[in-house]
């Protein structure tokens, strides 16, 4: 599942590899997947995407945006894997969506458990979790302070576990079950411990673990349980890039 470190990694890779490429053909699923969700009919995606140029990509919480010409946005998330192939590479047999570009390279979207591949012709995305991701302060940002985290804890039901506090309802956009396991391990906090019984020191330790774990994961290109644009999670940071350059 795409979580914040992979979202940031993937959006950077799309910017580096795909910006300026124009979509020439759209191929729909060769193996329909009942838990792949689309915005409207995927059979109409060709009309919406062919001729559009990828301008940029942005990552918000659990969402990766492909910003296209003519104000079109393609938006993916959850269990969607995206792989970029060079011209002449063998086309995989199974996929949920395939885009070809003007240089004969192509982009393949597949879904494991569940995921969404949406296209919005007017850039308007009516999704409460997307709005939350856009409007919230990223935990990677210096603006996400301990005061922000304390507010989150104060507003949570005290019967919530530490794991549920971090991993459910997108309270912190882009933080799910995957990264939460590492955050709690690094904080040395039992996932089942109730928020009510977290001491002030534990809250401080948990906040620091949240920030440091996400920054480290993102800097290293995401978790090694996920794949990136090239089917591997490699360290994509530039030689001069530091952890402070992530957002």
Model-derived features: where do they sit?
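Short histidine-centered catalytic/ligand-binding loop motif
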Residues: 88, 131-142, 193-200
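Short, amphipathic alpha-helical segments
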Residues: 89-93, 143, 156, 173
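A short, charged helix-loop
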Residues: 118-155
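Basic, nucleic-acid-binding surfaces and adjacent catalytic neighborhoods in DNA/RNA-processing proteins
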Residues: 22-44, 58, 150-243, 247
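Catalytic cores of large soluble enzymes that bind and process phosphate-bearing ligands
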Residues: 2, 6, 141, 202
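Acidic, proline/glycine-enriched N-terminal capping motif
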Residues: 1-131
